[in-house]
Each structure stands twice: as C-alpha cells, then as structure tokens.
UniProtKB/Swiss-Prot annotation:
SMART domains: Gp_dh_N. The modification S-(2-succinyl)cysteine is found at residues 150, 245. NAD(+) binds at residues 11-12, 33, 78, 120, 314. This is Glyceraldehyde-3-phosphate dehydrogenase. The gene is GAPDH. It comes from Cricetulus griseus (Chinese hamster). The lineage of its organism: Eukaryota, Metazoa, Chordata, Craniata, Vertebrata.
C-alpha cells in the first residue's frame, strides 16, 4: 500500500485523510501544516460540522497524530522544500494547501524525498487526471499530477458517457456550488473579483469556473466545446452541475437515462451514480461518488437539446478520488 503525506490540513487535507482511513486504499504516514498545532489537529480531525464526528479514534501521542492506532508524523514547515517526507516514509504527497498548484511550486516536495505529488486542485501546467475518464493516460514518467477540480470530476464522467453515446456538439455548464473557504462570511475585500467578496451566507453569487473548459483537457475531443460558470449559494456542502448541450445524434431522454444507468452499474461504478429518487442536496452529504445523475431533474427541449443534472459532494466525493488516483498510480509503479 502506498505511503502518503498530506500538505495542508484544511477541508480537503482532512477529508483525504478520512477517505484514506475509511477506504484502506492508501496509508497516511505524515501531515504538514504550519498553522495548526498537534492538539488542534486532533480536534479538527475528530469534529466536523459537515460530515459529523470521526467514527474511529484520534489522539496526540509522543508528538504524533494517532488515528485508529496508526501514528502519523507531524511537520510544521511553511516552505514545502523543507518538509522531510522521505524521513517519514511518505512516497506520494497530496498538495492540498491550494497554494502550490504549479509544477514548479508543487515540485518542491520532491526535494524532501517524495516520489510523486498529487495536487488536489486544478493546475495551470500539471497534467490533470479524472478517475473514470482519462486515468489510463497516466504514465510512470509523471512526477507531478493534478486531480482537477471537484466540479470537473462531476462533469467529466457524465460528459464522457453522453459524448461516447450521442456526441456533444457544444454545451454550457452551470454549477450551483456550496460555500467554500475562499469566500467571506460578511462583505469584505476580494482582490479583483469583487462579487466573490460579498457575504457567502446572504447571497447567490455568480462566479467564474474553469471546470467546464478543463473537461477539454481530460477529454480532448471536447476541447473548445464546453464552457461554464458558477453560482455560489448559501449551503455548506454538496453542489450540482447543470449541463445543457446539443447532441450530434438525436436521443430520447429515456435513451440518455438508459446509457447513464448502464455506465453507473458498469465501467463507472463508484464514480458516476444514478438515481430516480426525489432527492435534494442534503441527500448527497458524505457521498463518495464524483457525480450522481438525477434522472428526474433533467429536461429535453427536443431530441438534440437537453439539460442534464448531476449532484456531487464537492468535499468528500473529490477527496475519495484523490485517494483513488494515488492507488491507481501506485498500481503502475
């Protein structure tokens, strides 16, 4: 089992660690976070307002974080080049600070003995992989990769199924997205993106997202055919993608449902879900799928123009894919 270090113990860092323990697919051996001391790590890992209390045991012992009896080395370095991942036995590093997202910056982890780095965010220059879509393009020569964004992980599997079966001529995506840490609790300054600085709990905030364009990077045939935007809404977690697209081959909505259901039970099992239930966002909290197609919510204007709806837990679903990508990479060593 591959040994993993986590850099940045925020929402994704903590949930990747949870996903590692619940899935048993990778082993977390080290965590670096200069802003959180050990006792605070215990508290933050144990208690989670969104996903509930951790079901195992967590304690601090001999300067280490001990989860379910497993001792994890703690570092508190600001500069990633100074983290001694090798000494802790970490082979792969999850870069989840949201700060070191380029090849050059994330590459600093390699100096401390890490063999590979997985960026838990979109990257300007690192190759992006979406499980269920293009992981087969991964090869051993790649030291630094990106797991793309939570929204790309929701959209890409659905877009792949639709494109493979009916062909997507062009499409627009909207994600109705839960609040994340980059937003403000009350109105405040926000650099160039003025709207993003408005109170997160009070507003529906139009925002930009590169998630749809990024699908073109993981499915090259869709490059230039998709773009999208986001509405940030006052919910703590779980988001939903609306993909409105023009189809090459005419299809009845029932045909679309059928192929998505087949994919969800076959090649994309565990990644793409399918439901005909009358669900709402809450129902997907702590769901580990990348994307769950809502058969009852979509609509068709005609056989070539459809609106498709898919839900995702933008925290936990994504964190599980980070773990899956690492397990997949380890299988290719």
């Amino acid at each position: 089992m591959v040994k993993v270090g986590v850099n940045g113990f925020g929402r994704i860092g903590r949930l990747v660690t949870r996903a590692a323990f619940t899935s048993g697919k990778v082993e977390v051996v080290a965590i670096n976070d200069p802003f959180i001391d050990l006792n605070y790590m215990v508290y933050m890992f144990q208690y989670d307002s969104t996903h509930g209390k951790f079901k195992g045991t967590v304690k601090a012992e001999n300067g280490k974080l001990v989860i379910n009896g497993k001792a994890i080395t703690i570092f508190q370095e600001r500069d990633p080049a100074n983290i001694k991942w090798g000494d802790a036995g970490a082979e792969y590093v999850v870069e989840s600070t949201g700060v070191f997202t380029t090849m050059e910056k994330a590459g600093a982890h390699l100096k401390g003995g890490a063999k590979r780095v997985i960026i838990s965010a979109p990257s300007a220059d690192a190759p992006m992989f979406v499980m269920g879509v293009n992981q087969d393009k991964y090869d051993n020569s790649l030291k630094i990769v990106s797991n793309a964004s939570c929204t790309t992980n929701c959209l890409a599997p659905l877009a792949k199924v639709i494109h493979d079966n009916f062909g997507i001529v062009e499409g627009l995506m909207t994600t109705v997205h839960a609040i994340t840490a980059t937003q403000k609790t009350v109105d405040g300054p926000s650099g160039k993106l003025w709207r993003d600085g408005r109170g997160a709990a009070q507003n529906i905030i139009p925002a930009s997202t590169g998630a749809a364009k990024a699908v073109g990077k993981v499915i090259p045939e869709l490059n230039g055919k998709l773009t999208g935007m986001a509405f940030r809404v006052p919910t703590p977690n779980v988001s939903v993608v609306d993909l409105t697209c023009r189809l090459e081959k005419p299809a009845k909505y029932e045909d679309i449902k059928k192929v998505v259901k087949q994919a969800s039970e076959g090649p994309l099992k565990g990644i793409l879900g399918y439901t005909e239930d009358q669900v709402v966002s809450c129902d997907f909290n702590s769901d580990s799928h990348s994307s769950t197609f809502d058969a009852g919510a979509g609509i068709a204007l005609n056989d070539n123009f459809v609106k498709l709806i898919s839900w995702y837990d933008n925290e936990f679903g994504y964190s599980n894919r980070v773990v899956d990508l690492m397990a997949y990479m380890a299988s290719k060593e």
